A protein has these predicted regions:
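Conserved HGGG/HGGXW glycine-rich cap/lid loop of the alpha/beta-hydrolase fold
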Residues: 6-61
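Active-site loop/oxyanion-hole signature of alpha/beta-hydrolase fold enzymes
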Residues: 51, 55-92
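Gly/Ala-rich beta-loop-alpha elbow adjacent to hydrolase catalytic centers
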Residues: 93, 97, 101
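Flexible "cap/lid" loop of the alpha/beta hydrolase fold
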Residues: 102-107, 113-148, 183
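Conserved alpha/beta-hydrolase catalytic His-Asp/Glu region
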Residues: 149-199
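Short beta-strand/loop motif that positions the catalytic acidic residue
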Residues: 203, 209-211, 215
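Conserved alpha/beta-hydrolase "acid-adjacent" motif
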Residues: 216-222
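Catalytic histidine-centered segment of alpha/beta-hydrolase-like enzymes
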Residues: 241-253
Length: 265
């Protein structure tokens, strides 16, 4: 394990495996780098995979509350890239990690070769003057389950039941990152307050949007909105997938490989 130093001096734990073009994995809220589990292993067969713990999570330091915004967390991601000796990378963000990836692509476009956004959104609805698109909002039961932390309620929102039964270790690791209640609350707030709609047009990196058709935490209309706001984007709908499609649908790895190969050729 290695440590990068963030702008405010906080140490950020990171690791890498594999060889080839660098790929930075950005986890969702309150999820450690270990939560990428089998997906990181699959990707490391083709890329140099760089993973890290967000501030307040796992082996990383905490820092001040004011640093917990998706835009500032993108600065942390950039610090990890620098520490890893990667001037640029393919950036793959899941959920809040996708929100962080958006800011990295907006603020430091030279560092993002391609952008992969899984189960994420641009934040609050783009037209505040209009009625919000209720179809894009998480349903109340799903949001209540997320806040509760009850694994029995959370697991079906993320994973196919058969996959979860056959991947007990990966499921356990994903839901059991080391994090204080203080850090979890800051991550939740950062994710919920994310709003990048007005700046998504600045993203120049080729972008692959992966989204499950049954995602109740970040419903599919969010992906359609992202597709409309990011010029060089492609949307792949994953039939039957929930919020954890980055793990329980390993076929997404091949789609990512094909997407990167076409953009790099």
């Amino acid at each position: 394990m290695n440590f990068a130093e963030a702008a405010d001096g906080v140490e950020l734990a990171w690791t890498s495996e594999g060889e080839g073009e660098p790929m930075l994995l950005i986890a969702g809220q309150a999820t450690s780098m270990d939560g990428w589990g089998p997906t990181a292993e699959l990707l490391s067969r083709y890329y140099r995979v760089i993973r890290f713990d967000h501030r307040g999570i796992g082996h990383s330091g905490r820092g001040d509350a004011e640093r917990y915004t998706t835009r500032r967390l993108a600065n942390d991601a950039a610090a990890v890239l620098s520490a890893a000796g990667a001037e640029s990378a393919h950036v793959y963000g899941h959920s809040m990690g996708g929100r962080i990836g958006q800011w990295l692509a907006i603020d430091e476009p030279q560092r993002v070769r391609t952008l992969i956004l899984a189960a994420t959104s641009g934040g609050r609805m783009p037209d505040s003057a209009a009625e919000p698109d209720s179809a894009a909002e998480p349903d109340k039961a799903a949001l209540d389950a997320l806040v509760s932390g009850d694994l029995a309620r959370l697991e079906p929102l993320f994973f196919d039941s058969e996959w979860a039964r056959n991947n007990l270790e990966a499921t356990h690791t994903f839901f059991n990152s080391r994090a204080s209640a203080w850090a979890k609350a800051r991550h939740f707030r950062a994710s919920r307050e994310h709003d990048a709609w007005s700046e998504l047009g600045a993203i120049t990196a080729p972008t692959l949007i992966l989204h499950g058709t049954e995602d109740r935490l970040t419903p599919l209309p969010n992906a359609l909105l992202l597709r409309g706001h990011i010029a060089r984007s492609v949307l792949v709908r994953v039939p039957g997938a929930g919020h954890g499609l980055h793990l329980d649908h390993p076929g997404t790895v091949e789609w990512i490989r094909q997407f990167i190969a076409r953009r790099s050729g």
